[in-house]
Amino acid sequence: MNSLISNEVYDVESGLRKVIESAKANFCESVDVAINLNINSSKSDEQVRGCVVLPKGLGREIKVAVFAKGGYLEMAREAMADIVGDEELIEEVKKKQCKLDVDWCLTTPDFMASVSSIAKILGPKGLMPNPKFNTVTFELAKAIKMIKSGQIKFKSDKTGIVHAKIGNIKFSIEDLLENFNAVISAVKQCKPASIKGLYFKDVFIISTMGKSVKVENLNN
């Protein structure tokens, strides 16, 4: 976690302004939210993961690769997937002949076994298709459209913190706030059933190189 701008707790809009003001890097810094959850990530039933479509997008193109066969290949191409292929593409990935410079990988249920052969390559990059993220589906066109409209995935880390991008410093405060609220709402919907009391411990907003700010309690 980046150091705090101050020990003050801000309302979300003021916090966003402070983060943007403190971003001094010579590139367009991203703006992220970090949500410290009152969970035990070592327990499988308290792990938090999900997807959310950012209403104002990420401010950049989201790239998608699709592993499939037969007619699903053409479906993926028509839906404007960036990389499309079957077993041949899998072999290229194994041999490092294809650099998967993408944000998401999708496949169909009948092709999942083939994709599993490159799980050790996709997994560490966070690209392994997963039914929980709706990235193992026969409805490829629908999934690709959803992703490219601004869908992101989130997952609690081993310390119980969820990190998610909500845009960059060139976004308007209003657009960042709308994306922020979408992420907060999605994480709340993923609250484990075993958590009966406090769910959000702390919420911070951070830019890539700038300092972070703590924002007001958002448990309600």
From Swiss-Prot:
<dbReference type="InterPro" id="IPR023673">
    <property type="entry name" value="Ribosomal_uL1_CS"/>
</dbReference>
<dbReference type="InterPro" id="IPR005878">
    <property type="entry name" value="Ribosom_uL1_bac-type"/>
</dbReference>
<keyword id="KW-0687">Ribonucleoprotein</keyword>
<dbReference type="GO" id="GO:0015934">
    <property type="term" value="C:large ribosomal subunit"/>
</dbReference>
<dbReference type="GO" id="GO:0006412">
    <property type="term" value="P:translation"/>
</dbReference>
<dbReference type="GO" id="GO:0019843">
    <property type="term" value="F:rRNA binding"/>
</dbReference>
<comment type="similarity">
    <text>Belongs to the universal ribosomal protein uL1 family.</text>
</comment>
<keyword id="KW-0699">rRNA-binding</keyword>
<keyword id="KW-0689">Ribosomal protein</keyword>
<comment type="subunit">
    <text>Part of the 50S ribosomal subunit.</text>
</comment>
<comment type="function">
    <text>Binds directly to 23S rRNA. The L1 stalk is quite mobile in the ribosome, and is involved in E site tRNA release.</text>
</comment>
<keyword id="KW-0810">Translation regulation</keyword>
<keyword id="KW-0678">Repressor</keyword>
<dbReference type="InterPro" id="IPR028364">
    <property type="entry name" value="Ribosomal_uL1/biogenesis"/>
</dbReference>
<dbReference type="InterPro" id="IPR002143">
    <property type="entry name" value="Ribosomal_uL1"/>
</dbReference>
<dbReference type="InterPro" id="IPR016095">
    <property type="entry name" value="Ribosomal_uL1_3-a/b-sand"/>
</dbReference>
<dbReference type="GO" id="GO:0003735">
    <property type="term" value="F:structural constituent of ribosome"/>
</dbReference>
<keyword id="KW-0820">tRNA-binding</keyword>
<dbReference type="GO" id="GO:0000049">
    <property type="term" value="F:tRNA binding"/>
</dbReference>
<dbReference type="GO" id="GO:0006417">
    <property type="term" value="P:regulation of translation"/>
</dbReference>
<dbReference type="Pfam" id="PF00687">
    <property type="entry name" value="Ribosomal_L1"/>
</dbReference>
<keyword id="KW-0694">RNA-binding</keyword>
<comment type="function">
    <text>Protein L1 is also a translational repressor protein, it controls the translation of the L11 operon by binding to its mRNA.</text>
</comment>
<protein>
    <recommendedName>
        <fullName>Large ribosomal subunit protein uL1</fullName>
    </recommendedName>
</protein>
<dbReference type="InterPro" id="IPR023674">
    <property type="entry name" value="Ribosomal_uL1-like"/>
</dbReference>
